[in-house]
C-alpha cells in the first residue's frame, strides 16, 4: 500500500530536512539569493529581490507539496531546499524536485545526503514504485548530478514550462523505480561516506 509523505523531519548524518516553515524564508533567501543558483533555471531562472518576494512567490506552490528546508547537521545552517510533490497514490508515483542549494555546498555530501533521505522516505516509508526527478535542458550541472544518483534519463519534454522570465523551458525527465532503489541507495551511501 502506498501512502503520502507525512511531513515529518528527516534526519541523517549530514543533513536534516525540516518541513519548510514561514519563518525559514529569511535564511533560505540568504542561502539561495545568488545569481549562480538561478542561472541554471532554479525557480524559473529569476532570483527574488527579497525574502518577502521569495515567500510570496513560493508559498502557493509550497502549499501543494512536501517542501523541506535543508540544514547541515554539524551547525544547523540553512543550505537549501528540496521537496516531494506531484503525489499519485493510485499509480505509486512521486516527484522529487524543487531543489536548490547555496553554492558553498555544491559538490559536497549535502545533495546525495538530501536525496538519500527523501528517496528513503518515498520508497521505504511510503511505498512508492516510481520517483521522478527533472531539470531544465540547459541545466547541465543538475543533469549530471541526477545521473550520478543512478537515475535513468527518460527523455525531454519540449516547451514544457514557462519560466519566470517568460521564456519556455525544455525539461529533462529522469526516474528511479522501486526495484532500482537498493542499488541507488548503496551508491548514495558510498558517496556520503566518501
Question: What is each residue range found by the language model?
Answer:
Residues 142, 165-166:
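Short Asp/Glu-rich motifs
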Residues 1-110, 121-125, 167-194:
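GNAT-family acyltransferases
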Residues 133-143:
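Conserved beta-strand-loop-alpha-helix junction that forms the acyl-donor binding cleft
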Residues 134, 152-165:
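Conserved catalytic-core motifs of GNAT/GCN5-like acyltransferases
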Residues 124-134:
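Conserved GNAT acetyl-CoA-binding A-motif
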Amino acid at each position: 500500500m502506498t501512502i503520502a509523505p507525512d511531513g515529518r523531519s528527516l534526519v541523517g548524518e549530514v543533513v536534516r530536512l525540516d518541513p519548510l516553515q514561514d519563518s525559514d524564508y529569511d535564511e533560505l533567501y540568504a542561502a539561495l539569493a545568488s545569481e549562480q543558483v538561478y542561472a541554471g533555471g532554479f525557480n524559473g531562472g529569476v532570483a527574488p529581490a527579497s525574502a518577502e518576494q521569495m515567500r510570496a512567490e513560493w508559498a502557493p506552490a509550497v502549499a501543494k507539496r512536501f517542501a523541506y528546508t535543508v540544514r547541515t547537521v554539524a551547525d544547523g545552517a540553512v543550505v537549501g531546499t528540496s521537496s516531494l510533490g506531484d503525489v499519485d497514490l493510485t499509480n505509486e508515483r512521486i516527484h522529487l524536485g524543487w531543489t536548490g542549494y547555496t553554492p558553498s555546498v555544491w559538490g559536497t555530501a549535502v545533495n546525495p545526503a538530501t536525496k538519500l533521505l527523501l528517496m528513503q522516505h518515498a520508497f521505504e516509508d511510503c511505498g512508492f514504485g516510481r520517483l521522478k526527478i527533472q531539470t531544465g535542458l540547459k541545466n547541465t550541472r543538475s543533469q549530471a548530478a541526477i545521473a550520478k544518483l543512478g537515475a535513468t534519463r527518460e527523455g525531454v519534454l519540449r516547451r514544457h514550462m514557462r519560466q519566470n522570465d517568460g521564456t519556455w523551458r525544455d525539461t529533462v525527465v529522469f526516474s528511479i523505480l522501486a526495484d532500482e532503489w537498493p542499488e541507488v541507495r548503496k551508491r548514495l551511501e558510498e558517496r556520503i561516506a566518501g
